[in-house]
Design a protein with these regions (language model features):
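Class I SAM-dependent methyltransferase SAM/SAH-binding core
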Residues: 1-23
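A short acidic, Gly/Pro-enriched loop at the edge of an enzyme's catalytic core
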Residues: 22-34
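Short loop/turn motifs at secondary-structure junctions
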Residues: 8, 30, 61, 120-123
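A short glycine-rich, Lys/Arg-flanked "PGG" loop and its adjoining helix->strand segment in the class I
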Residues: 49-61
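C-terminal lobe and adjacent flexible extensions of AdoMet/dcAdoMet transferase-like proteins
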Residues: 138-145
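C-terminal alpha-helical "lid/dimerization" subdomain adjacent to the S-adenosyl-L-methionine
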Residues: 68-131
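A short SAM/SAH-binding and catalytic strip from SAM-dependent methyltransferases
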Residues: 31-47
Length: 145
């Protein structure tokens, strides 16, 4: 592939602090695939169910949801990935106050898969892990029931 051959596809929609995606922005059953990369753990817990349901609403039956998130199965890993986030935020110029207010609801990837299953998705295959990634980012695929 030569440089410059890939053009921009689609339209950018701001995350809007994990508010449910409106049908005006993305109509029902209009997407074949959605991706959430290192994002679910930042969603405030009271907003998580409605946000997940809105993703489900946008996908066609059999549509794919790709999720990448930390597989946090111990307090030590939670501390480590929190530190990784703090360093990342500070590298972007975020203040300590902004970083301290950044919600980080880390959990095992199996819990994410179970939660998504409860909202109408089915996991497909096994979680993939990048070799030598100390923050245990897992990549999972789910399909809309």
């Amino acid at each position: 592939m030569e440089r410059g051959q890939v053009s921009k596809l689609g339209q950018f929609l701001p995350l809007d602090n994990y508010k449910p995606i409106s049908a005006a922005d993305i109509p029902d059953a209009s997407l074949d695939m959605a991706t959430i990369y290192i994002g679910f753990h930042h969603c405030p817990l009271p907003q998580l169910p409605a946000f997940i349901d809105s993703i489900h609403r946008t996908l066609r039956p059999g549509g794919t949801l790709i999720v990448r998130d930390h597989d946090v199965r111990s307090p030590e890993m939670a501390t480590f990935v929190s530190l990784v986030h703090t360093v990342f935020n500070l590298g972007l110029g975020a203040t300590w106050e902004v970083d301290a207010g950044d919600f980080k609801g880390f959990r095992p990837i199996k819990e994410w898969a179970d939660m998504l299953t409860a909202h109408g998705f089915t996991p497909v295959g096994k979680a993939l892990f990048q070799p030598n990634d100390p923050s245990d980012n897992a990549l999972i695929r789910l399909i809309k029931n």
